[in-house]
Amino acid sequence: MFIISLTYIKPLEEVDALLEEHVAYLKEQYFLGIFLASGRKVPRDGGIILARAVSREEIETIISLDPFYRHGVAEYAISEFTPTMTSDDLAFLRE
C-alpha cells in the first residue's frame, strides 16, 4: 500500500488549467483498482492519494502518467506501508 503526497510547485492557476486532465487520470486509476482514495490537502497546496500496487516501481510508472507530473506542476513523495490494523470497513486492506 502506498501514500502518495503531491505538493504543488507552480501557481494554482497552472494547477487548475490541468485539473480536468488530472481528474480523468485519477478516474482511470480508480477503474483499474489502483487508487483507493484521493483528495486535496488543506490548505490547498497539494493532494494525497492512497494506492495499492505490486511494487514501488509500478507506482512510479503510474505517477509518471499524471498530467500534474508530466507538466511539472507538482512534486511527489511516495511512502509505502503495510496496513496491519483497519476499521472493519477496510478489512480488505489488511496484510
What name fits each language-model region?
Residues M1-E95:
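Conserved, structured core segments of small domains
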